[in-house]
């Protein structure tokens, strides 16, 4: 048995995290400037390698925590990327995850130390290697999941208006949503509660805030 393992090549198992945030009606990605070769100084997703004493899920949580300082964040595995020449440094198979976070709740000092920045998803710079394909796959998976489960609420603060909620889903799908139909669908949801608080950031009159009664967190 030992000869079987030793006679086969070893390779690296990497983790790449696609971190989504929502700000001022736009979907954003947290990207960083790579500080090592190959591709030093170019735009990249946050990543790392799976260690011998951790599962791929635990590795993804660690990578996310190292950048944002956050725990108990919604994360989902997207797929593996394993093209032979995908990383010019070494033979690396990368397991991709996406995470949904409140853009106002993360360790800003840690993000600055990693030279990371929030970038509008519609204005992304050129990304290294196969990272553009990773982002595309992750966004499609998020769109599919958001159509059947309330995962989008993980991108919002605890209190929000229905207009903000509609703006979020328009950003997720990249298209306008009919207000009347959207409000009708929201009214049928039993996990949204109206509060007595008024949000006046959009107008002098203000709009009633609502809250989401439970978040979809990772299992």
Language model segments and positions:
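Conserved small/polar residues in nucleotide/adenosyl-binding loops
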Residues: 213-219
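Conserved Nudix-box catalytic region and its N-terminal flanking loop in Nudix hydrolases
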Residues: 26-70, 82, 147-167
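Short helix-coil junctions and helix-kink-helix linkers
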Residues: 168-175
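Short, cationic-aromatic polyanion-contact patches
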Residues: 204-212
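Short, Lys/Arg-rich nucleic-acid/phosphate-binding segment
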Residues: 197-204
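Active-site segment of metal-dependent pyrophosphate-handling enzymes
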Residues: 11-13, 58-61, 65-105, 123, ...
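N-terminal strand-loop-strand
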Residues: 2-43
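NUDIX/MutT-family hydrolases
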Residues: 98, 107-142, 146, 155-163, ...
């Amino acid at each position: 048995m030992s000869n079987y393992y030793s006679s086969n090549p070893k390779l690296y198992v990497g983790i790449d995290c696609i971190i989504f945030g929502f700000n001022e009606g736009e979907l954003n990605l947290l990207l960083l400037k790579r500080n090592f070769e190959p591709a030093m100084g170019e735009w990249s997703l946050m990543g790392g390698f799976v260690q011998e004493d951790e599962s791929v899920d635990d590795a993804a949580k660690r990578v996310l925590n190292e950048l944002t300082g956050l725990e108990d964040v919604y994360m989902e595995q997207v797929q593996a990327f394993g093209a032979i020449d995908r990383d010019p440094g070494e033979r690396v198979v990368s397991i991709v995850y996406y995470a949904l976070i409140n853009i106002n709740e993360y360790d800003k000092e840690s993000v600055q130390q990693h030279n990371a920045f929030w970038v509008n998803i519609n204005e992304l710079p050129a990304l290294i290697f196969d990272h553009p394909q990773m982002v595309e796959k992750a966004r499609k998976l998020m769109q599919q999941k958001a159509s059947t489960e309330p995962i989008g609420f993980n991108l919002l603060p605890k209190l929000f208006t229905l207009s903000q909620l509609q703006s979020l889903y328009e950003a997720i799908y990249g298209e306008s949503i009919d207000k009347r139909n959207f409000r009708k669908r929201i009214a049928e949801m039993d996990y949204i509660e109206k509060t007595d608080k008024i949000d006046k950031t959009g107008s002098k009159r203000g709009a009633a805030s609502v809250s989401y009664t439970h978040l979809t967190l990772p299992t």
